[in-house]
Regions:
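Conserved core positions of repeat-based scaffolds
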Residues: 103, 152-155, 164, 232-235, ...
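Loop/turn-rich, solvent-exposed surfaces of beta-rich toroidal or solenoidal domains
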Residues: 393-397, 401-406, 412-416, 436-481
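An edge-strand/N-cap motif at the start of beta-rich repeat modules
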Residues: 84-117
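Blade-level signature of beta-propeller repeat domains, shared across WD40, Kelch, NHL, RCC1
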Residues: 470-472, 477-480, 485-535
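Fungal eukaryote-biased detector of long internal structured cores
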Residues: 156-171, 175-181, 188-349
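Surface loop/turn motifs at the tips and blade-to-blade linkers of beta-strand repeat domains
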Residues: 136-137, 145, 214-218, 258, ...
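Conserved beta-strand position repeated across blades of beta-propeller domains
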Residues: 131, 147, 155, 227, ...
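Ser/Thr-rich, low-complexity intrinsically disordered regulatory regions
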Residues: 1-96, 527-535
Length: 535
């Protein structure tokens, strides 16, 4: 896959060389091809759903049913009422630190959450550097935790609401975003020289952060975490339960949300998941860590990212959360790349499994082969000399930081995903292509000139590293301004993000989508509260 034509979704579409990969995504390169009329409900750059709705069956005419008595109607209404299990014992603490949220990147599908109209002369799309999102104000909204998916995002507020925004093609937002926006002639708009149009034509119901209805959750439910994949969202509760909505995709299109449900448009409780302490989302798979230190996985397993072999004729079994072959009771942290997974154990070991065709697992065996996968969790020996505290993965690269603040990277290098200039790479640790150009950094390497790193985050082909004193570095692919550096040129090495919006602010987290990114900073004098549904 050429470096300038990467996927449009975070941890989503694999390279052309990825075996059994998910549906190929659009190139990020701009095109001059004519575009048809498009309904305003859907962004021109959204993923096209591959699965068309089945025609409705013809029904024989039947006699009208007799009207129900008042007693029968009341009974039917009671029966239709959602039943939830009782709230269990608290095992998780809800976050309380209120955050300022800064966004940047493309935003043409509403994933920046800036709405659909120009505000104070600024467009809600093509944001080159970090911009404070007033729709997520620390005063009036109060975000305490946030997650970015491929083309959507989700956030948890201090008063226990879940907000979603971005692409809602397969129910990823968990709410109705129908919009009577009418038809737009996109070709005419692109040819227009008028840059002063206040309304971008983006669906305001998708591009404006909006709460998911509480009616889908058990009364008294308190949330502690949300995670977003490419086409789904999941929420973890204080008592270790998990709600989810959306769908998982495979190379054939929509795989399903459960064995019986193709697309879940609104939140539903996943009944088999209990005592969960943390979640992590890949492109189309989820990991969950329980209170005993065990890990379960579900979703699409075509690249063995679930840690178990999936037989094609029984592929829907991958949608059932099942355990992974890790040492029992020892896992303390989980993380996902697009098609690969990681686990950190209490003894300081790092385990990896899933896709490894660009050495993204940090395992040299079969790295560089088109169909390279690691079926079962394998210990990453190259990381044994470091006490890894945080880890993340993109489509074909990964990064981590140690307890000493070191930044380590590995995997695909042709788009500067690993933050090294080519002449600084150690030849013995690199696989070269047929043109003798660096292709894969097989062995995790410490990136020079950055220190005190406390957390890391990866987009498709770009990355972030946050320091203990609240600064943030970015590097990699930047065609849609997703590095926050104000340029569409690749950023070769970790570079400090510095503009008036975040200068002097303490950044404590970075979150990378496909063509957009999010920074979370400590809000000035923000309240620390987290309410309860129905309170």
């Amino acid at each position: 896959m050429p470096p300038k034509a990467r996927t449009a979704v975070s941890k989503a579409a694999p390279s052309e060389k990825t075996a059994a990969a998910a549906k190929p995504a659009k190139s990020q390169a701009k095109t001059t091809a004519a575009k048809p009329l498009t309904n305003g409900n859907t962004s021109s750059r959204k993923r096209k759903a591959e699965d068309e709705a089945s025609p409705q069956p013809e029904l024989d005419a039947v006699a009208p049913l007799p009207k129900k008595t008042k007693t029968e109607a009341a009974a039917a209404k009671t029966k239709a009422k959602k039943l939830f299990p009782e709230i269990g014992k608290k095992i998780n603490d809800a976050p309380t630190q209120v955050l300022d949220i800064y966004v940047f990147g493309e935003g043409t599908s509403g994933e920046l959450g800036l709405g659909s109209k120009r505000v104070n002369g600024k467009k809600p799309i093509d944001v080159k550097r970090p911009r404070l999102n007033d729709n997520l104000s620390s005063d009036s909204v109060g975000i305490v935790q946030i997650s970015s998916g491929g083309m959507h995002a989700a956030a948890l507020t201090r008063d226990n609401r879940i907000l979603t925004w971005g692409v809602n093609d397969q129910g990823a937002l968990g709410r109705d975003t129908t919009w009577e926006g009418g038809l737009r002639d996109l070709e005419k708009e692109e040819d227009s020289d008028d840059e002063d149009e206040d309304d971008t034509g983006i669906n305001p119901n998708e591009s404006t952060p909006t709460a998911v209805s509480n009616e889908h959750f058990a009364p008294g439910t308190k949330f502690v975490q949300v995670v977003a994949s490419d086409s789904a969202t999941f929420a973890l509760t204080e008592d270790g339960r998990v709600y989810g909505w959306g769908t998982f995709r495979s190379s054939d299109g929509i795989l399903g949300f459960t064995e019986k449900i193709k697309v879940q448009q609104t939140p539903m409780l996943l009944p088999t998941l209990k005592n969960i302490k943390g979640l992590s989302a890949g492109s189309n798979h989820i990991l969950a860590l329980d209170h005993k230190g065990n890990v379960v996985a579900w979703g699409c397993g075509q690249q063995n990212q679930l840690g178990r072999r999936i037989i094609e004729r029984n592929k829907l079994s991958s949608l059932i959360p099942q355990g992974i072959g890790l040492p029992r009771g020892k896992t303390v942290k989980i993380a996902c790349g697009a098609y690969h997974s990681f686990a950190l154990d209490k003894n300081g070991h790092v385990w990896g499994w899933g896709l490894n065709n660009f050495g993204e697992l940090g395992l040299q065996s079969n790295a560089g082969e088109d169909d390279a996968v690691v079926l079962k969790p394998a210990k990453i020996s190259y990381l044994e000399d470091y006490n890894i505290t945080d880890i993340d993965g993109g489509v074909h690269h990964s990064l981590a930081c140690s307890d000493k603040g070191e930044l380590l990277t590995w995997g695909r290098v042709d788009g500067y995903q690993v933050g090294f200039e080519f002449d600084k790479l150690t030849k013995d640790d690199v696989i070269y292509d047929e043109r003798d150009s660096p292709r894969i950094l097989v062995k995790p390497a410490v990136v020079p000139d950055v220190a005190n790193i406390t957390s890391v985050a990866s987009g498709s082909d770009n990355s972030f590293a946050v320091t203990g004193d609240g600064k943030v570095y970015s590097w990699g692919f930047s065609a849609n301004y997703q590095t926050g550096q104000g340029t569409i040129d690749d950023i070769k090495t970790p570079t400090l993000i510095d503009n008036s919006a975040i200068r002097g602010k303490k950044i404590i987290g970075a979150h990378a989508g496909g063509q957009f990114s999010i920074l979370a900073g400590v809000a000035d004098a923000a309240a620390k509260v987290n309410g309860v549904n129905g309170a």
